[in-house]
């Protein structure tokens, strides 16, 4: 009995509690980053991230996904005409060739259109905060970005919104290109959804063997790579189609120095009726070099 008591005394002296052990930030193999929002305060949560926006619009919720080992999730709140939602940003300055991001999300309301959601990407050089690059075409050396989003807010369904060196656009402005699965995956309100997506960089850099894919509740919905799937596209709008032509693949970069350096938990809102409130929940975030999958129930 003396050894357990001694261990507990050491934990108290070091300021460690049971939650810190149970909810370790790196408890899975190949896990680079983990966030379960189980800290005592939001300020402690923010220490796990590189950058944040609108902390007043964030709060804890007692609503958690089925299978979660925790008791709290993060709520982000948008007030139309007052703010632009909120975000948490994590930088990985060491850079990676492939990243998987899994998170749980619950849309509580749908009053205002969602401008942007969660993203993976890379800056060269890496930055500890989001850079203002909207409307710019990457040159293969400076940046790449892809978000798992709602590209068509009138029809709530999942898709990619992607910036890369061969994206389509006008000579003056390049907005993210949209990638959709052949069968739309609709997004329900008031339900926890397990979302996972990945980016694999092209190697060698002159090749088009880069990829991206996403899964909803553990089911792969769309996977894009060199020669697959068949795609129909018009301008910057790409849709999986059995009657299309094989997708060329992604040349994400032409310089090996450009790597994946960021995860952006984004709830970016810009429209809506002034004063109306929208809210979203996030929980159980994991960033890894390999597929993660849903929580075990």
Where are the model-predicted features located?
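Extracellular carbohydrate recognition
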Residues: 189, 207-213, 271-284, 295
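Beta-strand acidic-aromatic groove motif in beta-rich domains, primarily in extracellular
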Residues: 86-87, 111-133, 206-211
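Carbohydrate-binding surfaces in secreted/extracellular proteins
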Residues: 37, 194-246
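Secreted extracellular polysaccharide-interacting domains
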Residues: 74-102, 128, 133, 170-182
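Short, aromatic/His-centered strand-loop micro-motif at the edge of beta-sheets
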Residues: 166-196, 201-205
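Flexible glycan-contacting loops in extracellular carbohydrate-active proteins
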Residues: 225-280
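Extracellular glycan-recognition surfaces and repeat-rich motifs
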Residues: 43-73
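Extracellular carbohydrate-recognition regions
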Residues: 20-52, 297
């Amino acid at each position: 009995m003396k050894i357990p008591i001694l261990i507990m005394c050491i934990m108290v002296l070091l300021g460690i509690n049971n939650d810190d052990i149970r909810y370790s930030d790196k408890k899975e193999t190949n896990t680079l980053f983990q966030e379960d929002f189980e800290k005592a305060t939001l300020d402690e949560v923010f220490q796990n991230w590189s950058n944040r926006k609108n902390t007043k619009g964030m709060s804890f919720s007692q609503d958690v996904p089925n299978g979660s080992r925790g008791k709290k999730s993060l709520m982000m709140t948008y007030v139309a005409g007052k703010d632009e939602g909120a975000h948490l940003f994590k930088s990985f300055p060491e850079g990676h060739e492939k990243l998987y991001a899994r998170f749980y999300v619950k849309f509580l309301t749908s009053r205002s259109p969602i401008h942007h959601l969660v993203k993976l990407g890379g800056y060269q050089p890496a930055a500890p905060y989001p850079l203002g690059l909207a409307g710019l075409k990457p040159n293969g050396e400076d940046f790449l970005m892809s978000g798992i989003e709602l590209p068509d807010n009138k029809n709530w369904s999942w898709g990619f919104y992607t910036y890369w060196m061969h994206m389509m656009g006008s000579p003056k402005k390049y907005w993210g290109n949209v990638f959709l699965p052949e069968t739309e995956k609709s997004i329900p309100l008031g339900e926890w959804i397990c979302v996972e997506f990945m980016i694999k960089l092209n190697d060698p850099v002159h090749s088009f063997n880069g990829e991206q894919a996403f899964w909803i509740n553990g089911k792969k919905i769309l996977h894009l790579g060199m020669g697959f799937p068949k795609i129909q596209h018009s301008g910057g709008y790409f849709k999986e189609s059995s009657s299309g032509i094989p997708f060329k693949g992604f040349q994400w970069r032409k310089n090996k120095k450009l790597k994946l350096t960021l995860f952006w938990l984004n709830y970016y809102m810009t429209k809506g009726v002034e004063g109306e409130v929208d809210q979203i929940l996030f929980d159980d975030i994991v960033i890894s070099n390999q597929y993660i999958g849903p929580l075990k129930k």
